Amino acid sequence: ILIVEDEFIVALNLRQIMSNMGFDVIGIAPDAATADQLAQRKPDIALVDLNLRDGPTGPQIGARLSQEHGTTVLFLTANASQLRDGVKGTIGVVSKPVDEQAIGTVLDFLVKHRVGEPASPPPSLRLFPNTLN
């Protein structure tokens, strides 16, 4: 899992939660350049914030990760309304703040979705149009 988040404490908390759940976090990217470097490791899943150290680059990062690397991308942001119709190739958005249980249910859904297993999206996840087609 790749975490694209510029708030260091939030990113560390996410990494700890995911590690405790048995997920391998390949890195934390606070900006587009770092995300592009870490993308070379082909993450299966990425959690991406919208507004990063280098500005509102999250949507572009998410689209690149999905389209160029085949990553399942979920936006995790306090500004979910900015993603009205979503970002092509990405799955959806969860509003911050989010608790450990919600992260767990969302990650479970993402893993199942990625491997083609049937799963219902958790209530905290707003799917983008055409996500499940």
Segments (PLM) and residue ranges:
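CheY-like receiver
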Residues: 105, 113-133
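Conserved acidic carboxylate
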Residues: 5, 77
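Conserved two-component signaling phosphotransfer/partner-docking surface
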Residues: 99-104
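Conserved phosphotransfer microenvironments
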Residues: 48-66
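A Lys-centered signature of the CheY-like receiver
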Residues: 96
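His-Asp phosphorelay/catalytic-motif detector in bacterial-type signaling
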Residues: 67-74
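Two-component/phosphorelay signaling modules centered on CheY-like receiver
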Residues: 7-27
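Acidic, metal-coordinating helix/loop segments flanking the phosphotransfer/catalytic sites
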Residues: 15, 28-45
